[in-house]
Amino acid sequence: MNIEEFVKERNEAMFSLKKEKIEAYCKKYDIHIPENEQVFWAGVYKYILAVENSPEHLRQKAIEWLDGHGFKRTIY
C-alpha cells in the first residue's frame, strides 16, 4: 500500500464518523483505541481539525463538539 492509499483509507474512516469503521481502521493498524468514549471522539475530532483538506462541514462539527465538551481544538 502506498501513502496515498493509506491516507485515503484513514480519511474515509475518520470522515465517516462511524465508530465501528474508525475502530476497524485502528485495529487494522494497531492504533490504540481509548476506552473513554469522550476521549475517543475528542481524538477523532482533533484529527479532523488537524487535516487541512477536511470537509468544512466536518470541521464545523468538530469545533462545536470539542468546544461543547471542554476540549482544546489542537492535538498538542
Label each region the model flagged.
Residues M1-K46, A50-D67, F71-Y76:
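Long, non-catalytic architectural segments outside compact domain cores
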